[in-house]
């Protein structure tokens, strides 16, 4: 069985092979059922140092559909366009490796670094959006929202940088 990274599995047999190539015959195509029933979008505030690499790795291993790096006012890390492009390329490589390691049916994308305002605009298209807040009182409403998430819904989760989000 071979996965294509886009959520499909193919049951194949090897028809022939050479030193650097194999010819396979597809016997069956089926949807990979290993993915979460909801698409989880992680809007991650840029953390200090190389912590984003570990965040991308673990998020992908846990089933996140897409990681969107967010440059916030309180973030210690400030990336210019050139640095941001290189970082995103590196994070995408980490996502590919983590997806393979975890046996994911898809390769989650790492989006371009965006501003908090751009992230909020993007999140408007999602079914459910959660922004954990360290000064929030009680968890009942959050638990209720999470309990009501249904298969097929898209869920955005915002996680701030070390300095938190701006009030």
What are these model-derived regions, one by one?
Residues 27-131:
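RNA substrate-binding interface of SAM-dependent RNA methyltransferases
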Residues 1-31:
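N-terminal positively charged helical leader segments and presequences
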Residues 50, 138-140, 165:
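Glycine-rich nucleotide phosphate-binding loop and flanking beta-alpha elements
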